[in-house]
Amino acid sequence: MNERYAKCIPFDKNVKGRIGGNPPKCIEGQIPSDYKFYATLVHPEKENIMLSIIIHQDYDTLIDNNKYPSIAVKIVEHEFSEIGNCVEKRNANLRMCSISEYSEDKDSENILVKIGGAPSLIQDEESYYKELEEHGFSFFLSIDEDGYSEDVTIGSYPFGYGALYLYKRCTTNEI
């Protein structure tokens, strides 16, 4: 897969991908009680499919469970769905912003999403990816909090001004 990139842009109801706000209507009932909606992205490999990301609501739990196989992040694949009304599953630290369409153009410093290629690791420590690779996973995409626009966060950065790396199983394409 060619490397592609997306940026954090002001909210636009005509753009499918976004960070923050209420979860998509179709996944509201799938979010565990101790998780909050983070983002929904257009699946880079599947037409008309979205990837919604939900994260543990407790920062310490999220950070303490940040390596495979103990991860406090869940991915839900689904068809596009309108923004739901489930305010209690909204992450209060995030304002709603859109995620631009994917492009092969990397001329910006403010890259939010990177798809394919090699991950740009913040901490290049084998312990973060070695077990994933040993179990047949390869890098799929990353979301780097350095790519947030100025007005995305209200309080704390969900990943402590870090990044989220998603890997997929090579044999099944499970993320």
What is each of the regions a protein language model found here?
Residues 1-175:
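Preference for intrinsically disordered or flexible, low-complexity segments
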